[in-house]
């Protein structure tokens, strides 16, 4: 059996995903980071961006994450996000409309959020 780490992706309002994984890639204020079993302990601030989780069974889970924290120690990774949603929960047409609306209104924050949702949905 390959080495694993336990992952918990939690939004402010719910647990989004929890399980065993072999690799997690997330965007932090210091740049993109990949965490594998045995990684050195870390604590960081999450940026808006897709999170990719390679599950122990060989699958891939992708989520759109907006702000929060990442913590890793003793092969336990916690992603505590202000907002997070799995790629298969994202309504692509709605996200596209929100992106166009944000561009029209010049709302950079809303534009970034819609862009992250679309990138996560594309990574399904």
From Swiss-Prot:
Membrane topology term reads: Peripheral membrane protein
> Locations of Basic and acidic residues compositional bias?
99-118
Localisation: Cell membrane
GO terms for biological process, alphabetical: proton motive force-driven ATP synthesis
From the UniProt entry, list the residue stretches annotated as the region Disordered. 99-124
Q: Which Gene3D superfamilies does this entry report, sorted A to Z? A: F0F1 ATP synthase delta/epsilon subunit, N-terminal (2.60.15.10)
| UniProt superkingdom | Bacteria
This protein's GO CC annotations: plasma membrane; proton-transporting ATP synthase complex
Any one GO molecular function term: proton-transporting ATP synthase activity, rotational mechanism
Protein keywords: ATP synthesis, Cell membrane, CF(1), Hydrogen ion transport, Ion transport, Membrane, Transport
- Where does the sequence pass through the membrane? none
Record PANTHER family: ATP SYNTHASE DELTA/EPSILON CHAIN (PTHR13822), ATP SYNTHASE EPSILON CHAIN, CHLOROPLASTIC (PTHR13822:SF10)
Q: How does this polypeptide assemble, per the annotation? A: F-type ATPases have 2 components, CF(1) - the catalytic core - and CF(0) - the membrane proton channel. CF(1) has five subunits: alpha(3), beta(3), gamma(1), delta(1), epsilon(1). CF(0) has three main subunits: a, b and c.
What is the similarity comment for this entry?
Belongs to the ATPase epsilon chain family.
Q: What does this protein do?
A: Produces ATP from ADP in the presence of a proton gradient across the membrane.
The name on file for this protein is ATP synthase epsilon chain
Gene name tied to this protein: atpC
